[in-house]
Structure formats: structure tokens, C-alpha cells
Amino acid sequence: MYVPETENDWLQIAKDFEIKWQFNHCLGAIDGKHVIIEKPPKSGTLYYNYKGTFSIVLLGIVNANYEFIYVNIGSNGSISDGGVFKHTTFHEKMKSNQLNLPSPSILPQSNVIAPYCFVADNAFAINENLLKPYPRRNLTHDQRIFNYRLSRARRIVENAFGILAERFRVLKRPIQINVHNVPKVVMASCTLHNYLRKKSSNYITRNCVDTEDTETCTFRPGDWRLNDNLVGLNRTERQRTADGNSVRQIFTEYFNNQGRVHFQERMINTMNI
């Protein structure tokens, strides 16, 4: 699995997100899932998660092509979901500027300078390099537009996890092996997912994933959603930062003005955002 190492690597990912999903300056979509395991002997509540099962956590970042560019596997299921990403080496390097992320630059067709960011859902804490949706209560029109535009990019990681579980069905039921070997099984699945994504045109079919028709403004959920067995992280309100809120406001204003797309007004109603 190749983790981007240079600024040019990251810029290529951002270009793909802009072209395919109309989200500028996006470096990847982040999400996490609980991989259900059989309770290890004498482990007490160490792996006991908020859903009442036993698990380890798979945290993943994907590019615009449904490929994993980073995974962290093995946090026990009882850990606070909001703390999973915070305790990864990736997060540590991001906060200490060791990832070679691109410097803030001007957004297309504007004079607005914005940083490059990852996108996630409400299980994660917003900051200057990680954007998440506005909470779904009393949203303004502009906030609904932002949430829709972010959802287009964020759904890529949801679909990557869904396809992963559909193709590697060991992830769809409690894994009954020594808990210390579970991360190896999960890593092998993620690595094979990337390989097959690159090598097989039939690995991901159109019906597998969520699809939008931006001309008719219709949405079709991916087939994996009919049998989604991976438990998501607990989506609770996380601490917000002033920098994170400011960056989100920059993108909100941009997507409602210079960066708007012709279908967004109809789609927020189609998708009830």
C-alpha cells in the first residue's frame, strides 16, 4: 500500500477529487469501521464496543478511485471512536507538518486561498486539515450546499469499505482467530482490494457503488448498502476548533459562489440534505 510521500503525490490525489467529485483541495476521505471479532479469552471489556459486540477498529483513508492510501488496524473496540484517528502516526505527522502536504493555494476561478484538507463525517473532530459536515439541525441553504458537496467526496470511503466487505466476506462475520492475527487478515484484504481495483475492470461495477446522475438529479445507492455488515464509528459531536470552522466557512462560501456546480441546488432536495 502506497502512502503518498511527496507534495506532487498529494496534488495528484487532489486533482482526481476535483475532476471526479468536484471537491477542490481534497487529499482523501477518512472513515473507520469496527471489525467484529470473537471475544478473546480473559479480555474483559477491552474489545467491547458501543454496539455491544467485540471488535478492533479499521481506520482508512482513500483516494478518489476507492483505493486505500493509508490504514490503521488494531485499536480495541472500547476506545473512544473520536480518539482513534487522533492516536495514529498519520495524525501525529499531519499535526507536526511531516506529511509534505501542499501549502494553501488559490481555489479555481477565484482569489480565495484555502488549505488542502481531508474529508470525514461527524465521528471526527474538525480542524484546519480535516473537514466534516455541519450538524443536521437548523441548516442554512449555504450549509446544505456544503454538506452535499462534502458528501460527494466522503462517500468514496464509505463505498470503499462497503466493497471491501462484499468482496472479502471474512469481514462480514465475527473473525474467529487469535486477536493478534486479525490485523494481518484485515491488512491483506485492504491490499488485495487495491490490487484488484487497479487490475480488474470487473472488481467494481457501476451498481456496486453509489451513483448520481447529475443531469436528471437522481441518486442510486450502491448494492453493498443492502448488506452492510461493518459497524461504523460512533457519530457524536466532537470538539471544534476556530481554525477548522474558518476553513469550513471558506469552502462553504466558495461552493455557493465561484465553485458552484449546476446540479447542486436540485440534488440537495433529491437527497434531502
Stretches with model-predicted labels:
Residues 1-273:
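Short, polybasic Lys/Arg-rich linear motifs in disordered N-terminal/cytosolic regions
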